[in-house]
């Protein structure tokens, strides 16, 4: 008995109630005879969290209606032919960088706070509160994404496929979020850096260090989104793979055409019994006619497929190029901010080097003055020895000794200063 694939994704009320009663946060009962103070780990709850049901918001492509559903990972894998590694990108228990993956029947998007699976008929947006970025912020981002997607589905006037509209809204949400963070970081950074150039303090240096850490993390995220868009733009096969509506239409047309040819074959086979034909000339003629019709049909399909693929690739490429310009502008702002921080660091290092040079010059002057003073110490030490010196009996000998020693010390000090300036140890 066949079931609607949408019904397989929705949980029955009893299953949802059982999942809520036996959720991953339920504490396991202690074993009999064991101590009552220990806390047991609910291994089955962890297994259910890793591979169980997730809360999603489903947006229908035809009507734009949204509803909250709980979808099991195995059901998604079976219905959309997605490998487990693709769904792992959307798992809130793991931290993965931004990624856009085009598959046979779906497009998997992990763009900042928007994690969704887009098909030709619907979009499933993950609204789990454990998603990185905070439960309330993620819930608000999902709500805005759904509202914007519904608005564009209602107001759309062009023939843009649903998957491109959903992808465009996701790219716009990610680019706007990253650009807002970049603007906020710029508003905090430039005044702080200007203040640091005039007043170097430990507090300002610590604030700049934290700001630079935020800048590096944000630049890495923006660079990843930019690389994903650029990688898609450089690969025509990946862009053609993301044209889900066209692939679905071709598949339906191929099935109808196959059924029509099977019906024609059956009717032709039935009529061959009622009318006598020549046993020699008829089968080769019918086979030749069949080959010509098949060849003409295949050529027509190939030409139509090539034209449609080229159109879809150009359409998607223009869409991606628009947001590539936006994210590249955000990256250029962050790069300019990083260069400004580097220039400020260089300026501070120059200032510190200048202060260090001044301290070295002062130390050199102090050392030279100490050497000159040491000359007085030598003279006083010589005259302080306990032996007879005839100079002690000469009138005014003490005054002349002080004058001559001072003049000699001053001359030696001036010679040192002249030498330092000649060797450019001191500024002229």
Swiss-Prot record:
GO biological process: one example: magnesium ion transport
Motif (Required for magnesium transport activity): 384-386
Superkingdom in the source lineage: Eukaryota
Transmembrane segments: 364-384, 400-420
General function of this protein: Magnesium transporter that may mediate the influx of magnesium.
Membrane topology: Multi-pass membrane protein
This protein's encoding gene: MRS2-C
Pfam families: MRS2-like (PF22099)
Protein known as: Magnesium transporter MRS2-C
SUPFAM superfamilies: Magnesium transport protein CorA, transmembrane region (SSF144083)
A GO term from the CC aspect: membrane
Subcellular location per the Swiss-Prot or TrEMBL entry: Membrane
Keywords: Ion transport, Magnesium, Membrane, Transmembrane, Transmembrane helix, Transport
